[in-house]
From Swiss-Prot:
CDD domains: RRM_DAZL
Keywords: Cytoplasm, Developmental protein, Differentiation, Oogenesis, RNA-binding, Spermatogenesis, Translation regulation
Native organism taxonomy: Eukaryota, Metazoa, Chordata, Craniata, Vertebrata
Residue span, RRM domain: 30-105
Tissue and organ distribution: Germ-line specific; expressed in adult testis and ovary. Localized specifically to the oocyte and embryonic germ plasm and to migrating primordial germ cells (PGCs).
GO biological process terms, semicolon-separated: germ cell development; germ cell migration; oogenesis; positive regulation of translational initiation; spermatogenesis
Xref: Pfam families: RRM_1 (PF00076)
Any single GO CC term annotated in Swiss-Prot or TrEMBL for this entry: cytoplasm
Domain DAZ stretches: 155-180
Description of how the protein assembles with itself and partners: Interacts with the C-terminus of pabp1 and with epabp. Prior to oocyte maturation, found in a complex with epabp and pum2 proteins and spdy1 mRNA; pum2 dissociates from the complex during maturation.
MF GO annotations: mRNA 3'-UTR binding; RNA binding; translation activator activity
Protein name: Deleted in azoospermia-like
Species this chain originates from: Xenopus tropicalis (Western clawed frog)
Length: 286
Protein backbone atom coordinates (compact mmCIF):
# COMPACT_ATOMS: atom_id res chain seq x y z
CA UNK A 1 0.00 0.00 0.00
CA UNK A 2 1.40 3.38 -1.01
CA UNK A 3 1.67 6.38 1.26
CA UNK A 4 -0.99 8.27 -0.69
CA UNK A 5 -3.58 5.52 -0.24
CA UNK A 6 -2.77 5.22 3.44
CA UNK A 7 -3.17 8.95 3.85
CA UNK A 8 -6.52 8.86 2.05
CA UNK A 9 -7.71 6.09 4.38
CA UNK A 10 -6.74 8.08 7.44
CA UNK A 11 -8.55 11.13 6.07
CA UNK A 12 -11.68 9.07 5.54
CA UNK A 13 -11.53 7.75 9.10
CA UNK A 14 -11.05 11.25 10.44
CA UNK A 15 -14.00 12.55 8.47
CA UNK A 16 -16.17 9.74 9.77
CA UNK A 17 -15.23 10.61 13.32
CA UNK A 18 -16.43 14.18 12.71
CA UNK A 19 -20.02 12.89 12.31
CA UNK A 20 -20.40 13.02 8.53
CA UNK A 21 -20.11 10.23 6.00
CA UNK A 22 -17.93 10.68 2.96
CA UNK A 23 -19.36 9.90 -0.44
CA UNK A 24 -17.94 7.09 -2.50
CA UNK A 25 -15.33 8.10 -5.03
CA UNK A 26 -11.69 8.89 -5.58
CA UNK A 27 -9.85 11.06 -3.05
CA UNK A 28 -8.17 14.06 -4.68
CA UNK A 29 -4.71 14.57 -3.22
CA UNK A 30 -3.62 17.98 -1.79
CA UNK A 31 -7.21 19.26 -1.87
CA UNK A 32 -9.47 20.09 1.07
CA UNK A 33 -13.26 20.29 1.13
CA UNK A 34 -14.53 23.39 2.92
CA UNK A 35 -18.17 23.57 4.03
CA UNK A 36 -20.27 26.04 6.00
CA UNK A 37 -19.19 29.01 3.89
CA UNK A 38 -21.29 32.10 4.48
CA UNK A 39 -22.62 33.98 1.50
CA UNK A 40 -20.73 37.07 2.67
CA UNK A 41 -17.37 35.27 2.41
CA UNK A 42 -15.33 35.71 -0.75
CA UNK A 43 -12.57 33.53 -2.20
CA UNK A 44 -9.77 35.90 -1.13
CA UNK A 45 -10.80 35.75 2.51
CA UNK A 46 -10.99 31.95 2.47
CA UNK A 47 -7.58 31.72 0.74
CA UNK A 48 -5.98 33.80 3.50
CA UNK A 49 -7.20 31.28 6.09
CA UNK A 50 -5.38 28.35 4.41
CA UNK A 51 -2.11 30.17 3.55
CA UNK A 52 -0.53 28.91 6.77
CA UNK A 53 -0.86 25.24 5.58
CA UNK A 54 0.81 25.76 2.20
CA UNK A 55 0.78 27.76 -0.99
CA UNK A 56 -2.81 27.81 -2.27
CA UNK A 57 -3.04 26.72 -5.90
CA UNK A 58 -6.77 27.14 -6.49
CA UNK A 59 -9.86 28.01 -4.50
CA UNK A 60 -13.35 27.52 -5.88
CA UNK A 61 -16.70 28.24 -4.27
CA UNK A 62 -19.59 26.27 -5.82
CA UNK A 63 -22.52 28.43 -6.94
CA UNK A 64 -25.86 27.77 -8.55
CA UNK A 65 -27.08 29.02 -11.93
CA UNK A 66 -27.93 32.42 -10.55
CA UNK A 67 -24.44 32.88 -9.05
CA UNK A 68 -25.48 32.41 -5.42
CA UNK A 69 -23.07 30.41 -3.27
CA UNK A 70 -24.16 26.91 -2.25
CA UNK A 71 -22.14 27.15 0.99
CA UNK A 72 -19.17 24.92 0.16
CA UNK A 73 -15.99 24.91 -1.95
CA UNK A 74 -12.55 23.35 -2.49
CA UNK A 75 -9.02 24.52 -1.71
CA UNK A 76 -6.06 22.90 -3.50
CA UNK A 77 -2.33 23.34 -2.76
CA UNK A 78 0.75 23.27 -4.95
CA UNK A 79 2.87 21.27 -2.58
CA UNK A 80 2.02 18.01 -0.92
CA UNK A 81 0.35 18.83 2.36
CA UNK A 82 -0.97 16.82 5.26
CA UNK A 83 -4.69 16.93 4.56
CA UNK A 84 -5.48 14.94 7.73
CA UNK A 85 -3.80 17.59 9.86
CA UNK A 86 -5.81 20.33 8.19
CA UNK A 87 -9.08 18.41 8.68
CA UNK A 88 -8.40 17.90 12.41
CA UNK A 89 -7.65 21.55 12.94
CA UNK A 90 -10.37 23.95 13.96
CA UNK A 91 -10.77 26.90 11.61
CA UNK A 92 -13.25 29.57 12.54
CA UNK A 93 -14.24 32.57 10.49
CA UNK A 94 -16.13 35.42 12.13
CA UNK A 95 -17.06 33.09 14.96
CA UNK A 96 -18.37 30.37 12.61
CA UNK A 97 -16.73 26.96 12.45
CA UNK A 98 -15.95 25.64 8.99
CA UNK A 99 -16.59 22.01 8.05
CA UNK A 100 -13.44 20.45 6.62
CA UNK A 101 -12.84 17.12 4.91
CA UNK A 102 -10.95 15.41 2.13
CA UNK A 103 -11.98 16.25 -1.40
CA UNK A 104 -13.55 13.24 -3.09
CA UNK A 105 -14.39 13.02 -6.76
CA UNK A 106 -17.53 11.03 -7.37
CA UNK A 107 -17.49 8.18 -9.81
CA UNK A 108 -19.19 9.08 -13.05
CA UNK A 109 -21.30 6.29 -14.35
CA UNK A 110 -20.76 6.22 -18.07
CA UNK A 111 -23.21 3.81 -19.54
CA UNK A 112 -23.93 3.11 -23.14
CA UNK A 113 -27.37 2.40 -24.41
CA UNK A 114 -27.40 -0.26 -27.07
CA UNK A 115 -30.26 -0.05 -29.48
CA UNK A 116 -32.24 -3.22 -29.75
CA UNK A 117 -32.63 -4.96 -33.04
CA UNK A 118 -35.46 -3.70 -35.21
CA UNK A 119 -38.72 -5.56 -35.23
CA UNK A 120 -39.08 -7.80 -38.25
CA UNK A 121 -42.56 -7.79 -39.71
CA UNK A 122 -43.61 -10.35 -42.25
CA UNK A 123 -45.02 -9.18 -45.61
CA UNK A 124 -48.70 -8.33 -45.79
CA UNK A 125 -51.03 -11.25 -45.58
CA UNK A 126 -53.53 -11.67 -48.37
CA UNK A 127 -57.06 -12.60 -47.39
CA UNK A 128 -59.46 -14.37 -49.72
CA UNK A 129 -63.18 -14.35 -49.03
CA UNK A 130 -64.75 -17.75 -48.44
CA UNK A 131 -67.94 -17.03 -50.37
CA UNK A 132 -68.31 -17.35 -54.12
CA UNK A 133 -68.92 -14.18 -56.04
CA UNK A 134 -68.35 -13.15 -59.61
CA UNK A 135 -66.75 -9.89 -58.55
CA UNK A 136 -64.78 -11.36 -55.68
CA UNK A 137 -61.66 -9.32 -54.95
CA UNK A 138 -58.78 -10.19 -52.69
CA UNK A 139 -58.05 -7.94 -49.74
CA UNK A 140 -54.48 -7.08 -48.73
CA UNK A 141 -53.60 -5.96 -45.23
CA UNK A 142 -50.94 -3.30 -45.42
CA UNK A 143 -47.97 -3.45 -43.10
CA UNK A 144 -47.56 -0.59 -40.65
CA UNK A 145 -44.93 1.97 -41.55
CA UNK A 146 -42.36 2.29 -38.78
CA UNK A 147 -40.31 5.45 -38.74
CA UNK A 148 -36.56 5.11 -38.15
CA UNK A 149 -35.54 5.40 -34.51
CA UNK A 150 -32.72 7.71 -33.54
CA UNK A 151 -29.89 6.06 -31.64
CA UNK A 152 -29.31 7.43 -28.15
CA UNK A 153 -26.37 7.00 -25.82
CA UNK A 154 -27.21 6.89 -22.13
CA UNK A 155 -25.17 6.52 -18.99
CA UNK A 156 -26.13 2.94 -18.06
CA UNK A 157 -25.63 -0.21 -20.14
CA UNK A 158 -28.67 -2.35 -20.78
CA UNK A 159 -28.59 -5.86 -22.17
CA UNK A 160 -29.72 -5.95 -25.73
CA UNK A 161 -32.75 -8.05 -26.42
CA UNK A 162 -32.66 -10.58 -29.29
CA UNK A 163 -34.45 -9.70 -32.51
CA UNK A 164 -38.14 -10.35 -32.29
CA UNK A 165 -40.09 -11.48 -35.32
CA UNK A 166 -43.81 -11.02 -35.45
CA UNK A 167 -45.48 -13.43 -37.77
CA UNK A 168 -48.94 -12.70 -38.99
CA UNK A 169 -51.17 -15.72 -39.16
CA UNK A 170 -53.75 -15.60 -41.94
CA UNK A 171 -57.20 -15.82 -40.53
CA UNK A 172 -60.01 -17.14 -42.68
CA UNK A 173 -63.36 -15.78 -41.68
CA UNK A 174 -66.72 -15.88 -43.27
CA UNK A 175 -68.25 -12.50 -43.75
CA UNK A 176 -71.87 -11.96 -44.75
CA UNK A 177 -72.20 -10.98 -48.38
CA UNK A 178 -74.96 -8.75 -49.62
CA UNK A 179 -75.97 -8.88 -53.26
CA UNK A 180 -79.07 -8.11 -55.25
CA UNK A 181 -80.82 -10.88 -57.14
CA UNK A 182 -83.15 -9.91 -59.92
CA UNK A 183 -86.30 -12.03 -60.06
CA UNK A 184 -86.44 -14.35 -63.05
CA UNK A 185 -89.86 -14.91 -64.55
CA UNK A 186 -90.77 -17.36 -67.31
CA UNK A 187 -91.14 -16.01 -70.81
CA UNK A 188 -94.84 -16.75 -71.07
CA UNK A 189 -97.25 -14.07 -70.02
CA UNK A 190 -99.72 -15.04 -67.40
CA UNK A 191 -103.20 -13.53 -67.34
CA UNK A 192 -105.12 -13.68 -64.16
CA UNK A 193 -108.92 -13.74 -64.39
CA UNK A 194 -110.99 -12.76 -61.45
CA UNK A 195 -114.54 -14.08 -61.35
CA UNK A 196 -117.07 -11.37 -61.85
CA UNK A 197 -120.19 -11.27 -59.74
CA UNK A 198 -123.14 -12.79 -61.49
CA UNK A 199 -126.77 -13.00 -60.55
CA UNK A 200 -129.54 -15.23 -61.84
CA UNK A 201 -133.15 -14.48 -61.19
CA UNK A 202 -135.59 -17.38 -61.53
CA UNK A 203 -139.27 -17.07 -60.90
CA UNK A 204 -142.31 -19.13 -61.70
CA UNK A 205 -145.71 -17.64 -62.16
CA UNK A 206 -149.09 -18.75 -63.39
CA UNK A 207 -150.92 -16.57 -65.79
CA UNK A 208 -154.61 -16.89 -66.56
CA UNK A 209 -155.51 -17.05 -70.15
CA UNK A 210 -157.68 -14.02 -70.99
CA UNK A 211 -159.85 -16.27 -73.15
CA UNK A 212 -160.95 -18.20 -70.05
CA UNK A 213 -158.54 -21.12 -70.39
CA UNK A 214 -156.45 -22.90 -67.79
CA UNK A 215 -153.59 -21.17 -66.00
CA UNK A 216 -150.36 -21.39 -67.96
CA UNK A 217 -147.24 -21.91 -65.81
CA UNK A 218 -144.16 -20.09 -67.06
CA UNK A 219 -140.57 -19.93 -65.85
CA UNK A 220 -138.26 -17.04 -66.68
CA UNK A 221 -134.46 -16.86 -66.36
CA UNK A 222 -132.69 -13.52 -66.17
CA UNK A 223 -128.90 -13.83 -66.34
CA UNK A 224 -126.66 -10.95 -65.50
CA UNK A 225 -122.88 -11.17 -65.74
CA UNK A 226 -120.20 -8.50 -65.60
CA UNK A 227 -116.81 -9.10 -67.16
CA UNK A 228 -113.69 -7.90 -65.45
CA UNK A 229 -112.07 -6.73 -68.67
CA UNK A 230 -115.25 -5.50 -70.35
CA UNK A 231 -114.40 -7.18 -73.70
CA UNK A 232 -115.62 -10.76 -73.41
CA UNK A 233 -118.86 -11.24 -71.55
CA UNK A 234 -118.98 -14.49 -69.65
CA UNK A 235 -122.10 -15.87 -67.99
CA UNK A 236 -121.96 -16.96 -64.41
CA UNK A 237 -125.04 -18.76 -63.10
CA UNK A 238 -125.60 -18.48 -59.42
CA UNK A 239 -128.83 -20.02 -58.23
CA UNK A 240 -129.96 -17.58 -55.63
CA UNK A 241 -133.47 -19.10 -55.44
CA UNK A 242 -134.71 -15.66 -54.72
CA UNK A 243 -137.93 -14.12 -55.95
CA UNK A 244 -138.05 -10.39 -56.20
CA UNK A 245 -140.99 -8.11 -56.46
CA UNK A 246 -139.60 -6.42 -59.56
CA UNK A 247 -139.55 -9.75 -61.41
CA UNK A 248 -143.30 -10.01 -61.02
CA UNK A 249 -144.05 -6.50 -62.21
CA UNK A 250 -143.03 -7.12 -65.80
CA UNK A 251 -143.35 -10.18 -67.96
CA UNK A 252 -141.95 -10.83 -71.41
CA UNK A 253 -145.18 -9.55 -72.96
CA UNK A 254 -144.70 -6.16 -71.19
CA UNK A 255 -147.88 -6.68 -69.25
CA UNK A 256 -148.27 -4.71 -66.10
CA UNK A 257 -149.51 -6.66 -63.10
CA UNK A 258 -151.18 -5.16 -60.14
CA UNK A 259 -150.79 -6.60 -56.69
CA UNK A 260 -153.88 -7.33 -54.67
CA UNK A 261 -154.44 -7.67 -51.00
CA UNK A 262 -155.56 -10.75 -49.15
CA UNK A 263 -159.23 -9.79 -49.54
CA UNK A 264 -158.96 -9.95 -53.32
CA UNK A 265 -157.90 -13.56 -53.08
CA UNK A 266 -161.50 -14.62 -52.67
CA UNK A 267 -162.71 -12.58 -55.62
CA UNK A 268 -159.99 -13.65 -58.06
CA UNK A 269 -158.67 -17.16 -58.67
CA UNK A 270 -155.40 -16.08 -60.17
CA UNK A 271 -152.76 -16.81 -57.58
CA UNK A 272 -149.08 -16.20 -57.87
CA UNK A 273 -147.00 -18.25 -55.50
CA UNK A 274 -143.39 -17.55 -54.67
CA UNK A 275 -140.86 -20.02 -53.50
CA UNK A 276 -140.54 -18.36 -50.14
CA UNK A 277 -143.84 -19.85 -49.02
CA UNK A 278 -145.60 -16.50 -49.30
CA UNK A 279 -148.81 -15.98 -51.26
CA UNK A 280 -149.17 -12.90 -53.35
CA UNK A 281 -152.42 -12.18 -55.21
CA UNK A 282 -151.99 -10.85 -58.72
CA UNK A 283 -154.76 -9.38 -60.85
CA UNK A 284 -154.32 -9.25 -64.55
CA UNK A 285 -155.91 -6.32 -66.31
CA UNK A 286 -157.82 -7.18 -69.46
Amino acid sequence: MSATEASAGEEAASATSQAFVLPEGKVIPNTVFVGGIDITMDEMAIGNLFEKYGKVKDLKIITDRTGVSKGYGFVSFYDEVDVQKIVKSQINFHGKKLKLGPAIRKMQRICTYVQTSPVVISPPTQFHPTWNSQNADSYIQHSPIISPVTQYVQACPYPSSPPMAIQQIPVGCQQPSYFQVSPQWPTDQRNYMFPSPAFTFNYNCCEIDPNGGEPMPREYHIDQAVSASGANLQKRYVDMSTQTIISCLFDPAKKVRLFASQEDYIQDDSVHQFRRSKSVIKRVSN
